[in-house]
Amino acid sequence: ILQKDPSKLKLGGERKEMSFLFMDIVGFTPISEYYKNNDDPEGLVALINDYLNRMTKIVLNNGGCVDKYMGDCIMAFWNAPIDCPNHAEMAVKTGIECAEETEKLKKIFKEKGLPPINIGSGVNTGTCIVGNMGSDTRFDYSVIGDAVNLAARLEASTRNYKTETGIEPLIYSSYTKDQLKNIKSVELDKIKVKGKDELVTIYKPVI
């Protein structure tokens, strides 16, 4: 893209409807303590990198763009810089596949005697500003806006919904649900989200 249009290498953004995913390891403290007690910080870094590598491949295979890593948290988005008409579908599909990959990791962790690993993912769809943000000398291609913030809030809310194997691995908003053509959804709850006056209806996929 940059080779075809070098003008994109400048500060500025555009308004666009997109889908956003935030994903985080839940219960990371026991895992961190395990490596700390065994005096193995290198092992912890290797574990995080393995997790990030697995999940990043899924994001990229589904046409997503990894915005940034924040510790063990991944932020990704769809529909920029390359258009993706079914961006909501691909974001939810990514969340489902990441949850499936985590189940494989759980078995590996169990074999190694590690504490169980769970992930929580939140997806939202809405209008944001996307573009190069930063200074004249250093900038990142990123997204900002209320719709982005809601995805992060939803990810944090996954901790409130327990399952037999951990927590609800993926929840998304009605804005995302309304654009899903090939994924069935079930309403999970109506929740109060910081910065929102009205309750937000959240859903999970029927797998």
Regions found by a protein language model. Give the residues of each.
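Alpha-helical scaffold within the catalytic cores of cyclic-nucleotide enzymes
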Residues: 46-64, 80-121, 146-159, 184
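Cytosolic regulatory/linker segments at or just downstream of nucleotide-handling modules
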Residues: 128-130, 157-207
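A short pre-motif secondary-structure segment
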Residues: 66-68
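Catalytic-site or vestigial catalytic-site microsegments of nucleotide-handling domains
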Residues: 17-30
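Regulatory cytosolic signal-relay segments
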Residues: 1-16, 33
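A short glycine-enriched loop-to-beta-strand structural element that forms part of the catalytic core
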Residues: 77, 115-131, 170-171
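Hydrophobic framework residues that shape the active-site pocket
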Residues: 28, 55, 74-75
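Short beta-strand->loop micro-motif that forms the acidic, two-metal-ion catalytic signature
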Residues: 70-84
